[in-house]
Amino acid sequence: MKYDYPHLCSPITIAGKTFPHRMFSAPMGGTDITNDGCIGPKSAAFYELRAKGGAAAVTVSECMVHPVTDGSHAYHLDTAVLNSLASATYAADAISRHGAVPSLELSHSGMYAGTYMTDKTRQHEMCQWGPSDTTRPDGVPVRALSKEQIDEIVQAYGTVAGLAKRAGFEMIMIHGGHGWLINQFLSPYFNHRTDEYGGSLENRCRFACQVLDAVRAAVGPMFPIEFRFSGSELFEGGYDLEEGVRIAQTLESRIDLLHVSAGTYQRGFGDTHPSMFKDHGCNVYLAAEIKKHVSIPVATIGGLNDPAQMEEIIASGKADVVYMARALLADPFLPRKVMENRSEDIVHCLRCFTCMAERAATGTRRCTVNPLIGREMEGDEVQPALVKKKVLIAGGGPGGLYAAWTAARRGHSVVLCEKEVALGGILKSEIALPFKREMFALTETYERFARNAGVEIRFNTEVTPEYVEKEAPDALIIAAGSRPLVPPIKGMDGEQVVVVNELYRNLDKISDKVVVMGGGLAGCECAISLGMEGKEVQLVEMRDALAPDANVRHRPLLLKEIEKQVKAVHTGYRAEEITPEGVWCTDANGERHLVEGTTVICALGQRARTDVVEQLRNTAPFVRVI
C-alpha cells in the first residue's frame, strides 16, 4: 500500500520488538483507580480504545514503585497489591489483543508526593521526601532521602518492572521528567546533595542510572526500556538543553528509547502540557538537538496532531517516534486513519484542557469533541435503529451536525436545515483566532461526516412551526445555538464597534488601538489574539476577575497570556458609553474613566436561543433540544 505519509507509517524496531508505525499513545491516567491501586474496568476500556484506534504502543500511567514514600494523586497504580497486578494484566491484555504494544509507566513523585491526594489512603499524612531538605513553594517541608531509602526505591523500580513484565506488559517507560523524583535528582534546582548523588552531572545522574540498571536486571535483555525526561527544565536554575544533551548521553547505554518532553509540572503546567497558545510540536527542537548526540531512537511529544507535521518530523530525522496524548482523546482512531490514508477524517484536539479539568473537578474524563471519552465501556459502535425514522435537525452548528451524523449512522433519514449560507454556528467566528483554527475546522470535519452518512443539508432554510408541519418529521432535534448579548450601551451602533462573533468578517476594520468589552473566555481570547498581532489592547470587565467561566486548567494559562499580550486590564469597570475616543466606564467607586481605543470589540457573552426552542418544542412527535 502506498501511504500518504510513508515515513510516519514505516515500522521501527526497538530492542528486537517491531512496531508497525511511529505513532505511540502517551501516558494518560485512568479515572476509576481503586484505593488499593487497581485499574478499574473503565480505565482498561479507556486504554483499549487507543489500541483499537491503531496506536503502535499504548502506555498505561502512572504506576507507583514505592508507596511508602510516594503517591501524588488518587490515580496511581500499585502493582505490589495482588488484585492490582491482576487488573494490570487485564489492561495489558486489552491493549495487546488489538495489535498494540502495552507499556507501563513507572513513576515516583518525590517531594511532590501527596500533593493531589484526596484522602485515598493514609498517604495524605505522610512525610514528603526528595533529594534534599527543603520547603516546597506551598510551605510543605521536604526531607532528604537517606542512602538506605534510595537503595529501597531503586530496588522497588526493579521489582515493579518485573511484575509489569509478568502481567503482560511488553515495554517499560521510566518517568524521569516533569519535576518528579528522578527529575529532582537530575536538576541542580532541586538537588543540593553533597554526597555521590549530588553536585556534578555524573552524580546527579547516578540515581537514574541505578534505577535503569535495576529495571534492566528485572526485565532482561531485548525488552524495550524507555526513559522519559525533560530535554530542558525551561526555568531559571533548572538544567537547560545543553545539559539535557549530556544527561541523554549519560543514560543512553541503559535504555532503548529516549522520550524527550519538556519542563516541570510544578514550575510550568503549560510547558509539560502545551496549551493552545503554543505552537504544535513546541518540544520538537529539544528532541532534534538531543538526537544529534545519541545513537538510540528518540521520541518527541507536545501538541502534535497533524500527520503532515509528524511526517516531516520523522522524514527530516528530528525524531524517530511521535507521542500523542490529548490528540488521541479527541480522536482515538487518528493512527488508523493515517495508516488508511483518511487523514481528512481526523477530529483534531482543541487543546482546551476539558479532559484534564474534568478529572480534577469530578474525577472523570471528558472531551469537548469526543463524547465517547468517559463512556468507553458503552462501546464506540453506533447500533442501527430498530425503527427507521424521518429526522429533522434545526441548526447547522457543531451540535446539530454531530446529531445529524449520529442519526444517519443509525439508519434514519436525516435532513439538516441551516438558516444561514454556511454551517458552523458560533464556530465560524473562531477562524479569526489563529490558535483556535482547529475549532473552526471542526465544522468542516463534521460536515464531511454528515454528508458521507447521507445527511441532506439545506442552507438558507429556517425551521419554523410551519416548516415542521410541512416536513412532518418523526423526530425533531433543535440545535438553535446562541446569539451574542449586545446591551443598549450608548454608541454601541457606532462604526468602530464590532461584535466578537463578527470579528472574522471585519478583520480589516480593526485599528491598532483596541478596547475589548467583556472579560469572559471569548473576550480574553480575542484580546490575546489581537495582542499577538501587535495591536495595543485594553480589556474592560465589569466583574472583579477575568474568565471565571474558563476551566481550572485553561484559565491560569489564559491569564498568563493576558499578562503578555494585553496592555491593560480594567476589572470592576462598567461600560456606559462608546465614543470615537474609546469607552467611558464607571468603576466600583462611581468614578468615570475613558479607556482609549479607536476600535471597540463587544464580547459581553452569549444567550441561548430559547425563543426558537419554545416555538418548536411541541411541533413533532419526538423533540429533543441540544
What are these regions (language model features)?
Residues 443, 459-461, 499-501, 571-573, ...:
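Short loop/edge segments at beta-strand edges and connector loops
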Residues 413-453, 504, 529-575:
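Rossmann-like dinucleotide-binding cores of NAD(P)H-dependent redox enzymes
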Residues 305-308, 329, 462-465, 503-506, ...:
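Short acidic loop-to-helix transition motifs that present clustered carboxylates
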Residues 318, 450-457, 493-496, 562-568, ...:
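A short helix-to-beta-strand connector/capping loop
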